[in-house]
């Protein structure tokens, strides 16, 4: 029995990046031997065990043979005769197919993953890459993480991804897995690389057709020097990742705030009147299809519907601003206003030449919300008001607080 550290922990150590969970592969053992040493079996589709002390996952070396369509259609062989090289061959990318001997620290790199790390190239291990459609998503997600480190996608890997998209292999992706990879990509430093990688492979139209439809739609060059709405969206996503690192909630709202521009009649281009209202329907459809969690849906719909109002905050009447806060449920969910401000700032700065622009509307929105939030129903009830009187007085007092905060700049 030999034990090796594999996958992301080895890769990240070589990149001198923070490592996440450690994964181990065991060569030359079977389930009975693992259990005899105290390992607890937990795998359903293939033999995976938890270490009796560390709780880390240890998997028996295995091969996988394609037996059907999609990412579940595999026959697994975890016989003790399976070699380390055979186990590494089934992995997706060369940089993830490096193993380190637990005892000696020696690296095993049969597919030149170290060379690709040094060259900053994301490359598939072998032809079996095309057998699992999830690997297209993983390639895009890894690019979102690694592009800031200078990585590019190998041309032959990009070609395989295009073949998979053209062949309909991506149709078998389940919504939960698409959402899982999208959410992780939105937590990375450069989400635009996720979008661009999928778009270039003609896979975005299958995975996120509502976002793919933005590419090629022109905007007014005086407001958007980048012109193409798809490019604008890439820039917004990257700015959002800078403003709120690792925050997929803000990232998803930023990603979907402009979906309505894809529905603007071509005769109206490059203007997009009412796009903030048109965008709600495709956003809801996307959320239903991918089974997006409610907190993500709600913030995204708010950002889609309200971002233009926040941009023109100074023009809004006090009562109109209060109505915006109510639509955001900002008195019960006050955190939404800071999140909305981040999305709107990303939208404003996600334009060529505006990447470092100031966005005073964000701080103003938070300040005015805080003033209104300081007024509460308990204080009014203490004054003897009851029932509907409290609601009416609360609205009036909050609007007055917004007006006072505007006048004093407090």
UniProtKB/Swiss-Prot annotation:
Its EC number is 2.7.7.72, 3.1.3.-, 3.1.4.-. Residues 229-347 form the HD domain. SUPFAM superfamilies: Nucleotidyltransferase, Poly A polymerase C-terminal region-like. Mg(2+) binds at residues 21, 23. CTP binds at residues 8, 11, 91, 138, 141. CDD domains: NT_ClassII-CCAase. ATP binds at residues 8, 11, 91, 138, 141. InterPro entries: CCA_bact (IPR012006), HD_domain (IPR006674), NT_sf (IPR043519), PolA_pol_head_dom (IPR002646), PolyA_RNA-bd (IPR032828), tRNA_CCA-adding_enzyme (IPR050124). GO terms for molecular function: ATP binding; CCA tRNA nucleotidyltransferase activity; cyclic-nucleotide phosphodiesterase activity; magnesium ion binding; phosphatase activity; tRNA binding. It catalyses: a tRNA precursor + 2 CTP + ATP = a tRNA with a 3' CCA end + 3 diphosphate; a tRNA with a 3' CCA end + 2 CTP + ATP = a tRNA with a 3' CCACCA end + 3 diphosphate. PANTHER family: MULTIFUNCTIONAL CCA PROTEIN. Comprises two domains: an N-terminal domain containing the nucleotidyltransferase activity and a C-terminal HD domain associated with both phosphodiesterase and phosphatase activities. A single active site specifically recognizes both ATP and CTP and is responsible for their addition. Monomer. Can also form homodimers and oligomers. Catalyzes the addition and repair of the essential 3'-terminal CCA sequence in tRNAs without using a nucleic acid template. Adds these three nucleotides in the order of C, C, and A to the tRNA nucleotide-73, using CTP and ATP as substrates and producing inorganic pyrophosphate. tRNA 3'-terminal CCA addition is required both for tRNA processing and repair. Also involved in tRNA surveillance by mediating tandem CCA addition to generate a CCACCA at the 3' terminus of unstable tRNAs. While stable tRNAs receive only 3'-terminal CCA, unstable tRNAs are marked with CCACCA and rapidly degraded. This is Multifunctional CCA protein. It comes from Xanthomonas axonopodis pv. citri (strain 306). The gene is cca.
């Amino acid at each position: 029995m030999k034990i090796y550290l594999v996958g992301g922990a080895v890769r990240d150590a070589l990149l001198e990046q923070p490592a996440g969970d450690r994964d181990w592969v065991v060569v030359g053992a079977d389930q009975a031997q693992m259990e005899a040493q105290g390992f607890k079996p937990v795998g359903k589709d293939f033999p995976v065990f938890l270490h009796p002390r560390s709780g880390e996952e240890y998997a028996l070396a295995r091969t996988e043979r394609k037996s059907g369509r999609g990412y579940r259609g595999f026959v697994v062989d975890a016989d003790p005769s399976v070699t380390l090289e055979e186990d590494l061959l089934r992995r997706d990318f060369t940089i993830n197919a490096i193993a380190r001997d637990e005892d000696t620290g020696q690296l095993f790199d049969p597919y030149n993953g170290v060379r690709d790390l040094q060259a900053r190239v994301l490359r598939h291990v072998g032809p079996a890459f095309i057998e699992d459609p999830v690997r297209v998503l993983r390639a895009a997600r890894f690019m979102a993480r690694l592009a800031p480190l200078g990585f590019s996608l190998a041309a032959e890997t990009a070609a395989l991804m295009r073949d998979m998209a053209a062949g309909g292999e991506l149709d078998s992706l389940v919504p939960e897995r698409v959402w899982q990879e999208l959410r992780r990509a939105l937590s990375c430093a450069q989400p635009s690389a996720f979008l661009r990688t999928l778009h270039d492979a003609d896979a975005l139209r299958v995975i996120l057709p509502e976002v793919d439809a933005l590419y090629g739609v022109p905007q007014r060059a005086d407001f958007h020097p980048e012109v193409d709405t798809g490019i604008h969206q890439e820039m917004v996503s990257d700015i959002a990742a800078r403003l709120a690192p690792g925050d997929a909630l803000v990232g998803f709202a930023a990603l979907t705030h402009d979906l309505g521009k894809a529905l603007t009649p071509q005769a109206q281009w490059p203007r997009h009147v009412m796009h903030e209202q048109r965008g709600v329907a495709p956003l809801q459809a996307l959320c239903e299809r991918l089974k997006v969690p409610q907190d993500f849906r709600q913030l995204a719909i708010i950002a889609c519907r309200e971002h233009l109002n926040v941009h023109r905050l100074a023009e809004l009447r006090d009562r109109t601003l209060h109505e915006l806060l109510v639509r955001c449920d900002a008195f019960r969910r006050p955190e939404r206003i800071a999140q909305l401000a981040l999305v709107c700032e990303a939208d404003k700065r996600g334009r060529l030449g505006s990447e470092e622009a100031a966005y005073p509307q964000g701080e103003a929105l938070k300040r005015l919300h805080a003033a209104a939030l300081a007024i509460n129903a308990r204080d009014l009830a203490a004054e003897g008001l009851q029932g509907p009187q409290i609601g009416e007085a609360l609205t009036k007092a909050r609007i007055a607080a917004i007006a006072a905060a505007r006048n004093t700049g407090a």
